[in-house]
Curated annotation (Swiss-Prot):
EC number(s) stated in the UniProt entry for this protein: 2.5.1.7
Pathway the protein contributes to: Cell wall biogenesis; peptidoglycan biosynthesis
Residue numbers of 2-(S-cysteinyl)pyruvic acid O-phosphothioketal PTMs: 117
Gene3D superfamilies, per database record: Enolpyruvate transferase domain (3.65.10.10)
Protein's organism: Chlorobaculum parvum (strain DSM 263 / NCIMB 8327)
Homology family: Belongs to the EPSP synthase family. MurA subfamily.
Protein's job: Cell wall formation. Adds enolpyruvyl to UDP-N-acetylglucosamine.
Subcellular location: Cytoplasm
Name under which the protein is recorded: UDP-N-acetylglucosamine 1-carboxyvinyltransferase
Recorded superkingdom: Bacteria
Binding of UDP-N-acetyl-alpha-D-glucosamine, residues: 93, 122-126, 307, 329
Active site: 117 (proton donor)
GO biological process, any: regulation of cell shape
Enzyme class, UniProt record, top EC level: transferase
Amino acid sequence: MNKLVIRGGKKLSGTVAASGSKNSALPVIAATLLTPDGTFGINRIPDLKDVRTFIQLLEYLGAAVSFENNRLEVSSSDLKSIEAPYELVKKMRASIYVLGPLLARFGHTRVSLPGGCAFGPRPVDLHIMAMEKLGATVTIEQGFIDAKVNGSRLRGAEIDFPISSVGATGNALMAAVTAEGKTVLQNAALEPEIECLCRFLQKMGANISGIGTTTLVIEGVDQLKAVEFDNIFDRIEAGTLLGAAAITGGSVTVTGTVPEHLGSVLDAFRQAGCIVTVKDDAITLTAPEELQPVDITARPYPEFPTDMQAQWMALMTQAHGDSTIIDRIYLERFNHLPELNRLGAHIEIRDNWALVHGPQELTGTKVMSTDLRASACLVLAGLVAKETTEVLRVYHLDRGYESIEKKLSALGADIKREQYQEFS
């Protein structure tokens, strides 16, 4: 098993490029299942564990896949299965994205209940509700979601999501693009990753309007085609790298970004006293002499992202004053808190929010990753901690960050990957 060994205390400086977004790549890859027509070519696909798992799933279904130098080529002309098995789906909750495309194309699919990060409830109710609204009969039996179309194809419908859900919005989009008639998605997710999926589906021939708003209107089409497409860059990775600059007192430029996708995060950095400048696709952050405490509440886009909440908690351990952190999306997403406290942080849980007392001097020790963003949080803490921090179980980190230790090392961090034996 792999761990990251970090010797903290180095101010980071320099320029680093953002990778392609995992959270947009996965639904885009799933959408290639919608048509047997041609071979897709998709650029800027990050080489991550979750992407590799999704490729395995496509290959299991019968797709021909080539992945090299961040370019993915997919042909779904000869699929042999409509079932996504537990052995693959258990590794990653985003596997649920195959539900809509397989149902739309074949009229029947069986998808194992998903896995992924182990924090809080992960209901699939909104995905099921969307498929049922479009005319499918859905049952859950023996750990599988079994969905069947009543008739020759799905039928357009009005779907009003009770809460904003990126996953359910994506699945509903992919199911609706070839449905008969018009589908209206109300309270659709606003995240840039959904806009990216919409642009991809449009390029394939889908008829979608209202992109970038909470109301998406889809007029079903009879046929879609394979296309070339460029994935968007990863706003969460960019935010994490900027956080590494802020926590170490450094100055870092992240290129290849879409700065407006990070508006709420950049605002929070500025409130903390950081100097943040934007020029074209580049964001430069210079840390202040003293970080100021900033309260954040994680909510759906365009508010502060839940996927940056853990990293922000690490940063606030160094702020001169107390701060509060609330997560309105995943109320229990605080698995990183005990490990931060092991490093010397002073963080308390009050009901469903965290109180971070700062500043606290952190001292390196062994800490264990529990999920993807918790791993990133512990890496940031290790960068500022005295002595040596060992972040164990970094397979979580590899699910969402492409060679992050290489990027941090290039910015001046003393960080390396090592193998270790974990005792059962």
